[in-house]
Amino acid sequence: MFRKIIYPLVSGFCLQLSLSGADLLKPYTGPSVPGVDTSTLTGKVMAGYQGWFNCEGDGADLGWTHWSRHKDQTFGPGNVTVDLWPDVSEYDPDELYETGFRFEDGAAAKVFSSYNKKTVLRHFAWMRDYGIDGAFVQRFANGLRDPTKKAHKDEVLSHAREGANRNGRAYAVMYDLSGLPKGGTKLVETDWRELRDKMQITNDPAYLNHKGKPVVTVWGIGFMDGGKPRAYTLKECYELVRFLKADGCTVMLGVPTGWRTLDRDCAKDPLMHEI
């Protein structure tokens, strides 16, 4: 059972003709079926949905991102970043992309793209079939500075929203701050306003709430990388959490393992506990 859902959940989707940003960032008006209780996080089994795999020819113009070490070169022998090969036996032909790998009979090995709408909807259908309540759709904040990468993230989120609604699942936004420069948390504030105002994401029936408020997760607060603090500061993170809470959100954090004792991979700063 799990071999068919765990690895592909880090994907997204594809449309041969991508929607424009204006079409993506609008309220959802499609079908929505009842399913899991989206009013609470309590008791939920949620997956993390990275949506970061791309394939040459998928329409995203991001090459072989996260499949290959060099995204502008074919995903094949000597150009690999993944540890596992996905089970693609249930995908349709229009969801698969030829790689540089070959089977013994000479046939090309194929993988999925996170830019394929059909694939994202399939993943949420699998969640329904196998008892996964929903997904935290990750938005890697550092990529919000790049229009091409942001367009990809918007498309993944748009189709995850549709997949959740069509399959009675829950979804929520998870921001990953990794790689942000100093001052970069302002990108998250701007992005959240856009999702709230243009997509009206917090009014969506499939969006996860907790204690009467929409859930937003912020991952990457207080980490030390190689013994050094990250470029974006704890003070910035503090202000970001304050912003989200003032906007009426329930805020969930992703923090280092040493957060309680302020050691190991965690910044030795009491502001961590205030956050």
Where are the regions a protein language model picked out?
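Bacterial N-terminal signal peptides
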Residues: Y7-S18
